[in-house]
Amino acid sequence: MKVLLTGACGFVGSALAEAIAAAGLGWEMTGFDNLGRPGSELNRRRLAQFGVKLRHGDLRCQSDVDALPAADWIVDCAANPSVLAGADGQTSSRQLMEHNLIGTLHMLEKCKREQAGFILLSTSRVY
């Protein structure tokens, strides 16, 4: 089974990758992350220990998504969960839409092309 984890270096993505590896299922895991958050580099090193092949890129960029290997399942853990969007001066509402909507659409289109399954973990922004 080939699994692609987006947001692999984030809190949820890295924990999921570790759990899959610990289950001993023999799944081939590819992680995809923009490495933009604090702690991403630490998680990157940890993922390598679990056999996750990490690809650096941006799911908002179609060419980055197109360069990813085919998968049987895509688990979309990538998101910008900022509840302070627009208020913190660092994250705009547009950036949230690009990450959380356009990026997800790119992954859904990849699933359709490859006939892969899809799991969306979503964000705290769905309330």
Question: Which residues make up each language-model segment?
Answer:
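N-terminal Rossmann-like NAD(P)+-binding domain of SDR-like oxidoreductases, especially those catalyzing
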Residues: 1-127
